[in-house]
Every structure is written in C-alpha cells, then in structure tokens.
Amino acid sequence: MSRRSTTTSTNFGLSWSLVDVISSSTAVFKVPMNGGCDLWIGCARWLRDMKVLTTDKNGTMLEFASVLRDGILLCRLANTLVPNGIDQKKIMRTNQPSPFLCCNNINYFAMFCKTYFNLEDADLFTAEDLYYMNGFQKVLKTLSFLSHTKESLSRGVDPFPDTDNNQEGTSNGSEFEDDVEIYQSLHDNIENVDPNRTIYGPITSADPEEQQSEQLYDRIVTNRKPSMNENDLQNTPTLKRNRCIRELYDTEKNYVAQALVTIIKTFYEPLKGIIPTSDYNIIFGNIEEINVLHTALLADLEYPVKVALGLSDATPPRPISLNECVPQTIGEVFIKYRDQFLAYGKYCSNLPDSRKLSNELLKTNEFISRNINELTAQGNCKFGMNDLLCVPFQRLTKYPLLLKELQKKTDLASPDRKSLEEAVEVMEDVCNYINEESRDTNAIKVIDEIEQSITDLSMPLNVKLHDYGRVNLDGEVKMAESTLTQAGKPKQRYIFLFDKVIVVCKAANKVMAAKTTGASARTNTFTYKNAYVMSELTIDKNASLDVKSGGTITRRTQYVIIMTRDRNENNEITQLTFYFKNEATRNNWMTALLLSKSNVSPTDYLRDTNHKVAFHSFRVDVKNPATCDVCDKLMKGLQYQGYKCESCNMSMHKECLGLKKCEAVRKSTHETRSSQSFNCNRPRFHIHEGDIVVANSNSTPSDLSYLQFAKGDRIEVIKMQGHNRFTGCLINNRNRTGLVHLDHVSQSRTTSMIGLSPIDSPAGSIAPRVVRNESTVLPNKLLSDGSSRSLSGPHGSRSSRNSSSSTINGSMDSVPRQQDYVNTEISEFLWYMGEMERAKAESTLKGTPNGTFLVRYSKNRKQTAISLSYKNDVKHMIIEQNSDGKVYLDEDYIFNSTVELVQYYRSNNLIEIFAALDTCLKNPYSQCKVFKAVHDYDAPSPNNEGKFLSFKTGDIVVLLDTVGEDRGWWKGQVNNKSGFFPLSYVKPYDPATEGSSSPVTPTSSSS
C-alpha cells in the first residue's frame, strides 16, 4: 500500500467572486457571490469553532467540498455533537479515494442524523449528493440544521447562517434552493482536486484521539525537564550525543516502569477472572509479551549505555547461554530484538477493538467499571487504563526517531556508527511491518464488507474475496464488454479492482431499516455481473481517446482504457473498454490497473534474471518471520507480501526481483546441454488449446489459482501456460476455470489435435517468467447483446481454420526431418507466408507494430526464418536444425518442430535468448490490417496530445481502431506515432501485388 503537501490560500470576504482553482492554474467557474458564499464560508467557520476543522483559513469552495467528501470529518462532527454517536471502529479510512468507503462513512453520518435528531429525508443529503457533488447545497442545509441544535449551541458556537429570526433550524430556508447554480461546477471539477494538497489537507489525518495519545505519551514517558540552553558554551558534540543516549535510556526506563509495569500490576493481573476471558483477551491483547520484551531490552541496554557515556561502573553482563551473544553497543541491542518487536503487530492491530470494548464495559457493566475505578485509585494512577494501553503504540513509533538522532550525533569514525545505522534500518523495517499488518487487518475487514455488499455473489467453500489481494481502486465506470463477434454497449458499472481480479458489479442502492429507530438510510449494495483475471488481460497503454457522435471528431471526446483477453470462442468476452469523462479519472484508473497487472505479472522487474515467480502469501509467524532473500528485510503484511521463485525457491520483495539472478537456471541449462535425451518435466502426451482431457485423480488444491475437479471430470484446455500446466475449465461447468497440471489428466479419445504447444518440447520446463495464478472461483457471465455490431476480422474465426488440421499431428514420428521444402504442417498456420526472401519480408513488415511477425522459407539459404517487426526495424532469426531433426533459435532451447518453436515464443519473451529483443511473437502479419496512404494528411494545429496522425503519400498505415468510422475517421499508426486520420486518405495495402513498387533497401546477404 501518504505524502502530503499544502498550498497557500487567502481569506476571502463576502464581496468576492468565486474562482475555483484546479492544479493552481485554471479558473473553472465564476459567478457573483451571494448567499451561497455566505453559506459555505459560514459552514467552514462553524466546523472550525466545533474543533472539527483545525485550519484558521478558508480555501476555495471546491477545496472545502473535497475534504468533506470521504465522510470522515462528518463522522468526527457527529461524535463531537454526541460522544460515541458513531462507532469509531466503523469509520473507514483509506490511502486512496474509494467511493465504497466514502459512501459508507456518509451513510453512517446520515443514520446518526436520523437516530439522534430525527431528521427527515427532506432535511438530509445522500451519499451521492456529497461524493459525486450532485447536491452540495443539501449538505450545507443538513449541517446548518445541526448548527442550530442545542448540542451545538450549548458549546457556545454560533450557528450558520447567522440569522436573528431563526434559531430552530434552517430546513426550509430558501437560500439553499436559490443558489443551486453556484454549486454546479463542483460535480465537473471535484475529481481534479486532491484534498491532501489543499489548505485543508492536514486536517483529514488529524485524529483527536491520536493527538491526545501523543500528549499522554509525553507526560508518562518523556517527562521532559528543563535542560541547558542549546547555545551554552559547553554544549559540545559529546554533550549533545550524551543527551541523546540519556533520552533513549531514560525514556525506556519510564516506559517500562510507568506504563508497562503499571498496566501489568494494576490492571492486567487483578482483572483476570473479573472480566470474561474473551473480553479480557481483547482488551489486553499480548501486553504481557511486550512487557517481557522491554524488560529484557532495558537490561541489555544498561551496559552499552554506560560504555557510551564513559561511566566507570560499566560491567559487561554475563551471557545466560552458550549461544547468546551479549550486545556490546546500543545498536546491537535493537538488532538483537528485531523479531521480538514484531509482537507489536498483533497489539497495534487489536488496539481499536480494545478501546471500543473497554469503553463499552465502563459504560454498561457497573461491576467491571467499579473494579477498574477502585484499582485505579489503589494504584495511585494518574491515568486511566484505556490511556495507558495506548502508550505502547506511541512508544514503538519513537525508536526510529531516537536512534536516527543518535546516529546523526555519532562520529563517522566511531565503532558504534555502523551498528547504529543498521539499528535505524531494523527499527524502520519493524515499524513498516507493523503498519502493513495493521493496514492489511483493516483492508481485510473492508473487503469482507464489500463481499457482503455484493448480494448475489456466491463464493466457494473456504474462499473469501480478500483471497484475491488488496483493492487498488473502486468506483463507477462506464464499461463495454465485447466478444469476437459483438461489440458491447457501454453500461454503467461499479468496478472493484483487486490485485488478481476485476470484479464487475451494478450498483443497487437499497433502503435498509435502522435497527434502533425504524428510520431508513441508504447503504451500498451491488449485484454481481462478471469477473476477469488480471493475468489474462493485456492493457493497451496507448489508447486514450474515443470520439462519439456529432459532425466532427472533436465533439463528445471520451477518455478510454482498452484491455484485451485471449479467448477463441465467439461468445467469450475478448475486450473490455472503460470510458471516462476526464483525463484525470482515466489516469487514476490506468495507474491502478497497471499496479494490479504489475503485482501479478512483474515482468518489468524480472528482466534478465530468469526467475519464474508467483505472487505469494507467506506464512505470518513472528517467531520465525519471513524475510527477503535479497535485502534480508521483513516480508510485510498479512498476504501477498512478495514473490517466490519456483526454480531457486528465493523469496523476494517486488523491488528486489531484478537485483539477483536465478541460480537454478544456470544449473538446469548446464544439465540440458549435457543430457538432452531426458527431461523429467516433459509431458507424456501432447495437448493443445481446445482439446478435451480427462482427470485421472481428484484435485482439491490449496492454491486458489488451480482448478478443483474430481476423477473422471472432462476438462477443456483454454490456454497453455508452460511448466506442464494449462488453464482449463470443466466441461459441465465452464464458469469454473483455473490451472491444471498435466500429471492430473490424460488424453480423451475424442481429443482433437489442432496444433503443437510449447509444453511438449524438451524446453517445456522453461516456463514464462511470471507464473500466472488465475482465478478459480469467480463465475463469468457471457455477453448476450444481440444489437451489437460485428468485430470479426477478415479472416474470421481461428477455430474454423484450425479444425481442418485436426489429424495432422497425430504422431511426432510422421513429421519429416528434411527441411528443403515447404512443410505442409506449417502451411496450416496464419503466420506462415511460404517462400519469401529477406528484402520482401522487410518491405512487408515495414511500419507494423512491435511484435508483428511472419515465418518464411528462404529459397536461397534453404532454411526457415522468422522476421519480426521491432522498434521501427525488422529483425530476422534463422531457425537452425540439428542432426536429430530438432529445431532451435538457441541451442539451449530445443524443439521438435517449427510449429512448436513458434508457439513457444508467442508466449515467451525472446529476451531469454536475444538480449536486444524484448518482445514475444505477438501478432501474425496476416492478421495485421495494413493500408497505404494515397494522399498527404497534415494534422490540424494545435494537435493537442497528438490526437491526429500526420502522414505522407506512400506511407504504410497500420489500422489500430475503427472508432469514428461512421464519421469518416479511423485510428492508425505510422512508425511509432498513432492518432486519428481520414479513412478516405488510405487504401488497402497488399505487398504481394505491390512488391515491385515497394521501397526496398538492398542488403549484402539474403536469408
């Protein structure tokens, strides 16, 4: 899983005009101010007086609205008016804007208003009114009503608007209806504002309880006394360092004696048996374990502190066991106790529940309340039990600061310097570990609530929605789902983007009865529509604009994200398109999608390492914590903390993936060279996409990415994945998909052999770099939109073409080894172009996108070659053949046939064998729609963001999209530039008929 900065602002008077500034530049709305200005400024003033807002300045109305949007300040206001009016545990905080969480908070506030102030729906606003800024005047109306209640007035705070004749409320005030136009700009511009970058930013994190705990820590632990003036003549570097050492040691003594021992002796031990065991364990958590830790740490600190201070009575402690290494420096003490500090993870995660439960017992259980009060008095405690239980969390956060300050004041030549630097890293690592554990604990609760809100989502036994990773973004998106033959219509959907899957829902806000008063409040509920596995999706980073209707391409511009999905059936969804009204929202979603994709498929981090990794959840064990094998730091969080390599078994953080190469690959490569005759990973039979296989055993995998099936089940092969695995689905339940290992299946007698797979080769064990952990539990829904237009290409469906070759590869022995003629087996594939020389291949592939390829037979060399378009150039690779008739591009990767070799490199990066080629064989040239410019076209000026594509007569234009075709426009690419162009300016291009006129660069050799 925040960086905050503030911008300056100005106090505005009542005579100014509203100018909302976005990104410190653009004036987006301007209207003479009247009552509307008075209202929001009055509301901001009232919230400041109520101590909910902590800034003494006004920003713009847009900034003010943005900080109310997540509902946290409203919940804080509710608890200011009525203490504990909203359960603190229910208030949801998030690092990124989440409509689901924000609307939940707003709904809690609405329920509070109905429960405690009997507000009617007419006096309330909905979550949509605030979050989407559809009715900000309603928000001000509700808050104005609350400002006139006795709970507010009793605090001596003036209400708003400040009128002499209305002291009971403003629910019927016309000023809220007269100025609706003032708030209309908020809806269009709210997405462009980051509340953390406004003048109000710091208030969103200023939790009053945290501030109170900080003050309490200072009183109990720090207990600062007046010290010498920093400018004192004797304030030498040594004295400064000694003061740091004393502060560290003295505060540790105070922490143990004044906080931990007091908790244990005054409350923890006496209350055992008085408070029910389950409640007792929640309230105190593992405080005893923390007390043991710090008692030992304090004892170990004594000797290094005395040595550092130069005290004469410093006596080295005796080790209590043969294996114990007694710390000699302050830094070594903290390094020694790193793993024990992880006990704070459980304590800090439990702290909110502890505070809530103890407060409830103090209010509702007279017997327990009386005992706690008596124990407080008997122990002469200046602070309550709840206050003391918050101190450990505050103490933990101080260690990195104290050690870092001591490090700064320690000379570089000091023998203590190195251990201090390491101690700072260790304690920062520990604090990050605790933060991630607390964050994941909260995130899992949120995801469980999301799962409950999707009313018709049916999950398999022992599988939860949070098993698919963290939620990286959620919100309403207009989305189209298209198949090979149907272009889907854009529909409003609610998307939950997890690390591993995209869950598609439809918002269905229902009215739920309140348990206490019979009132009703809107809650977030959804109906399940579909789900998509991130590892199966390819995100188009270039497509960004879509243009709809009107007489010109510049009208109704929408921002889009396009994702494609490998599927062969006509009724299976192959493309997802997200539509957005503005670029900022699109960029947010693109960033989140790329994050999810990168998490499950971190290919950019794996370059040249040969690791084969899977996104992995490491077992959380504070006694023996998982650490990264590269940096030796902790694997943080409760799930999917990092990656594990299947070859060398290394555990790694994401950022450490590229720092160390896989040693297992070197070993296996050597073994392959020395013994090509045997490969334990080679399957006993050949299967291909579209085949039907039969399960030869039951499989109930613990890994959610694998398919669950019973012996005898028939399974269809959807996609070969390498490493003797494929993605398959049950014939009797095609909604269930997942990985299947070849050891668990056998060939069906009715299997159709339609082509070879890379899994069949001796190199089959060299799997893709990222192990694809597909989903097995989320059902898919087929698209059935009869009104959609066809998307099929000129070649039609691949399945019909492949079916004709069903018996070609029945036996590997029948494949001729001789390669001095065109192999009829190869001719069945779209990528094979027959006889073609190097120059012709270059002119054919000129200008095509990266990864476009063809396979050709060179009559001159009597060899088969692959020609590939890459970075505005055409690369050629000769397919070599050994004495056994096997083929290869590199001798470490041997294949039985050319078909097998090509299929392998369609899903595996060529960088494995060619350092200069960072691509796979993506698209056969025959499937690439290529046109030739018949007129010059110059993009209009200004050509903002390269929306239009310029070209010259004779240029080769690759068609990317037919969007805008009904208005005479296509989207295409020339070299590495893309954009819209008039479709009448090009004609179909066929190298076969235009070969003589195509520009050809002579070469010295032909292949």
Swiss-Prot record:
What tissues express this gene product? Strong expression in the pharynx, proximal gonad, spermatheca, intestine and rectal epithelia.
Domain SH2, first and last residues per copy: 831-925
Q: Which residues form the DH domain?
A: 240-437
Name the GO terms of the biological process aspect: cell migration; negative regulation of Notch signaling pathway; positive regulation of locomotion; positive regulation of nematode male tail tip morphogenesis; regulation of vulval development; small GTPase-mediated signal transduction
Asked if the record carries the keyword Metal-binding, the reply is yes
Using the UniProt annotation, give all residue ranges assigned to the region (AC).
Answer: 151-239
Give positions of the Phorbol-ester/DAG-type zinc fingers.
Answer: 610-664
Q: Where is this region: Disordered?
A: 153-176, 778-817
Which residue intervals define the domain Calponin-homology (CH) in the entry? Answer: 37-151
Q: Which UniProt keywords apply?
A: Guanine-nucleotide releasing factor, Metal-binding, Phosphoprotein, Repeat, SH2 domain, SH3 domain, Zinc, Zinc-finger
Q: Name one Pfam family in it.
A: SH2
* Record PTM Phosphotyrosine, positions in chain: 183, 200, 217
Matching entries from InterPro entries are given as: C1-like_sf (IPR046349), CH_dom (IPR001715), CH_dom_sf (IPR036872), DBL_dom_sf (IPR035899), DH_dom (IPR000219), GDS_CDC24_CS (IPR001331), PE/DAG-bd (IPR002219), PH-like_dom_sf (IPR011993)
GO CC terms on record? cytoplasm
In this protein, which residues make up the domain named PH? 470-598
Task: Please give the superkingdom of this protein's source.
Answer: Eukaryota
Q: Where is the composition biased (Low complexity)?
A: 782-814
Provide ranges: composition bias, Polar residues: 163-174
Consequences of knocking out this gene: RNAi-mediated knockdown results in male tail tip defects.
PTM details? GEF activity is regulated by phosphorylation on tyrosine residues.
Main function: Acts as a guanine nucleotide exchange factor (GEF) for Rho GTPase. Has a critical roles in the generation of rhythmic behaviors: feeding, defecation and ovulation by dynamically regulating the concentration of intracellular calcium. Plays a role in male tail tip morphogenesis.
What's the domain remark here?
An acidic domain (AC) contains three highly conserved tyrosines that are involved in the autoinhibition of GEF activity.
Descriptive protein name: Protein vav-1
